[in-house]
Structures are given as C-alpha cells and as structure tokens.
Design a protein with these regions (language model features):
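Short hydrophobic alpha-helices and adjacent helix-cap/hinge residues
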Residues: 1-218
Length: 218
C-alpha cells in the first residue's frame, strides 16, 4: 500500500489512510472488512486477491480499488476486465511467466523436470500454474506440482518434491511467500534453484526472478 500512499501525497491530496494488515488470516480480513463498512469510508484500497474478494463481498456499494490481483475475472471481482461492471477496479500483477521459465532454463539448461508449489485454493496461483503448463510446451520439460492449504504444509510438500525436480518455480502466492525461509531450508541443501514469481520471496532465499515492481504497481 506504500505506493498508492506516496502517489496520493505527491499529488498534494489531503487523504487519511486507515491501514490494516490481516496477516494472511481470513478471519482478521473479514473483521477488517466489516469495520471498514461500518466506518462508511468513501473508498477501499485492497492489496491481493483474498483482500479484494473479502472487501467486495462486504462492501457492495463502496468503490474498491485493488492491486496485486492476477486475474480479476477469474477471482469474480469483475464481469470483464475492460468493462468491470462491478464496484471493483484496479491493477494486475500478472507476472511474465514465459520469461521466468526462460530464466529457469538459463540457470538449469539440462532441466528435465520442474516443480512448482502453491496454494491450491488461491485462484491467482491456479491461474499462473495453468499458464506455466502452456509455456512448458516450448521445452521438453515435465512439471511436478505440490499443493498446500496452509503454511504448515509447506515443509512436507517441499520435501516430497526433492529428488524429483531439477528446479522449483514459485508463483506469486501469499502462503508460499510467507513460508519462503521454510521452503529454502529444504531446497538450498538439495541444490535446487528456486525461481520466484515476484521480488518479495527473493528475500526469503529465492534465487532470481523477472517480475513486477509492487511499489510502482500501487
């Protein structure tokens, strides 16, 4: 949210922000949404798909600007990306998955199997993996998927991938991003390079990415 706050200040607009962080907890998110509605704020800015969906469900009559949402249509936030037809609009963080796959192949040119780990309940993650599958058609490479439903699953699922993959691709995924230190404690000793969908997970031990600048996106 820092990007939009700085942009508003740079334009000399007098706006007060009520910034809340749900800490990736859905119950916290629902409570924040209800409080925002009760406060009757004129506009809600939501970061990431879960936040945007929760705000949209709670605030039917309040304009909502979202960011860090990969696919607004798949998330059922808009009817059409060109003509939203709802009270939601915003910017997309769809990452250049084809370029990221090319990056993997530069690091591991003889790779035969690439793994990916993601939250199977997060629509954005599913969408990215489907694109990855299509991009893999350009290479003679097999994809092995590992899915989680919470941070607690990451260690076991990651361990299950080791020995089966030559590299690991991590899409933009809220659960995996928060569990990168756990993930890379497993991949690093196994010498499995981790290419990430965006910059944030690099600080948790990812090797490299070609991605979106989230500050500029805001």
């Amino acid at each position: 949210s820092r990007g939009i706050q700085d942009a508003v200040k740079a334009r000399g607009l007098k706006v007060t922000f009520d910034v809340q962080n749900a800490q990736a907890d859905q119950s916290n998110l629902a409570n924040i949404a209800q409080r925002f509605v009760s406060q009757e704020y004129p506009l809600i800015f939501a970061v990431a798909t879960p936040a945007a969906q929760t705000m949209a469900n709670a605030a039917k009559n309040t304009p909502i600007v979202a960011t860090a949402v990969t696919d607004y249509e798949a998330a059922k936030l808009v009817i059409n990306k060109d003509k939203p037809g709802t009270n939601v609009t915003g910017s997309s963080d769809l990452n250049p998955i084809g370029a990221q796959l090319d990056l993997i192949m530069q690091f591991v040119p003889n790779a035969k199997t690439i793994g990916t780990i993601y939250n199977s309940s997060e629509i954005n993650s599913q969408f990215q993996v489907e694109i990855l599958k299509k991009e893999l058609a350009r290479y003679n490479v097999t994809l092995v998927e590992g899915t989680v439903s919470s941070v607690n699953d990451v260690q076991q699922v990651a361990q299950g991938l080791i020995g089966k993959i030559d590299a690991l691709y991590v899409p933009t995924d809220n659960i995996i991003a928060s569990a990168m230190p756990v993930l890379t404690k497993i991949t690093t000793p196994a010498k499995v390079p981790v290419i990430t969908g965006e910059e944030g997970p690099l600080h948790g031990g990812g090797l490299a990415t070609v991605g979106v600048d989230y500050y500029e996106l805001g």
